[in-house]
């Protein structure tokens, strides 16, 4: 069985419909359990209760970057192989990615204010995340502005290529520049820098929950986009008749 079989809308609708309830259940279980567990953890000796924002901020930030990279992959599949489901999946993922980026920006400001004494700083990672959020908005606006769906998919695919620079910059900005207020990677594996287990395990669970939540929303929104495309085709056929 080839993976490209799932680019067929009929095959995708059947398979996604079968797994969607399980994905939703897993997303709810992991997210709720991880967040409750996380917010019951003890306060950090340096950051106090504000450290608990990590259970929202880190999963949202990781998903914001990875969703854009997923959109890049599906857009490349569209540009190379012209599979419509991949283009619709990229379109469906964009609003979810925009919300994740916004959550990361807001929670980052709330988390950083007590530590930095300011709600915003033109730190490399913060700035690249803001630019990534603007790319998400531009991507969605471009889909709405171009009437022909195939042309819209082509143009947004090119935009994905450009925006991927900022997605990667958001991920590795702390490594590129030593200056800046933002701390290093929260899940660093370097000796002496690993997060305490009391925070690490609920964070892993919340990250899994956010991934499953994205997957559930992606399947739901892609299925909706396929139905819209089918309805538009039927209406166009009736108008020609």
From Swiss-Prot:
Pfam name, any one: Cytochrom_C_asm
GO BP term, pick one: cytochrome complex assembly
Subcellular location: Cell inner membrane
Main subcellular location: membrane
InterPro entries, A to Z: Cyt_c_assembly (IPR002541), Cyt_c_biogenesis_CcmC (IPR003557), Cyt_c_biogenesis_CcsA/CcmC (IPR045062)
Membrane topology listed for this record: Multi-pass membrane protein
Residues passing through the membrane, by range: 19-39, 53-73, 92-112, 126-146, 157-177, 200-220
An example molecular function term from Gene Ontology annotations: heme transmembrane transporter activity
Keywords: Cell inner membrane, Cell membrane, Cytochrome c-type biogenesis, Membrane, Transmembrane, Transmembrane helix, Transport
Presence of keyword Protein transport: no
Source species, domain of life: Bacteria
GO cellular component, one term: plasma membrane
Matches recorded under PANTHER family: CYTOCHROME B_B6 PROTEIN-RELATED, HEME EXPORTER PROTEIN C
Membership in a protein family: Belongs to the CcmC/CycZ/HelC family.
Biological role stated in the UniProt entry: Required for the export of heme to the periplasm for the biogenesis of c-type cytochromes.
Protein name: Heme exporter protein C
Lineage: Bacteria, Pseudomonadati, Pseudomonadota, Alphaproteobacteria, Rhodobacterales
């Amino acid at each position: 069985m080839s993976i490209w079989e799932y680019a067929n809308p009929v095959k995708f609708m059947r398979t996604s419909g079968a797994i969607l309830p399980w994905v939703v259940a897993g997303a709810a279980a992991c997210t709720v359990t991880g967040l409750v567990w996380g917010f019951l953890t003890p306060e950090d000796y340096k950051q106090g209760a504000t450290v608990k924002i990590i259970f929202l901020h880190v999963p949202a930030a990781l998903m914001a970057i990875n969703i854009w990279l997923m959109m890049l992959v599906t857009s490349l599949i569209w540009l190379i192989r012209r599979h419509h489901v991949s283009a619709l999946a990229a379109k469906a993922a964009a609003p979810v990615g925009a919300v994740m980026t916004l959550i990361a920006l807001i929670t980052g400001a709330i988390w950083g204010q007590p530590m930095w004494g300011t709600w915003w700083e033109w730190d490399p990672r913060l700035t690249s995340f803001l630019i990534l959020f603007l790319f998400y908005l531009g991507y969605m606006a471009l889909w709405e502005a171009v009437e022909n769906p195939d042309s819209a998919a082509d143009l947004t695919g090119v935009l994905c290529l450009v925006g991927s620079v900022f997605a990667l910059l958001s991920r590795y900005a702390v490594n590129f520049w030593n200056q800046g207020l933002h701390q290093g990677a929260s899940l660093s594996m370097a000796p002496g820098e690993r997060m305490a287990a009391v925070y690490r395990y609920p964070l892993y669970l919340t990250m899994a929950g956010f991934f499953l939540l994205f997957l559930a929303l992606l399947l739901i929104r892609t299925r909706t986009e396929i139905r819209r495309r089918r309805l538009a085709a039927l209406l166009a056929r009736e108008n020609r008749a």
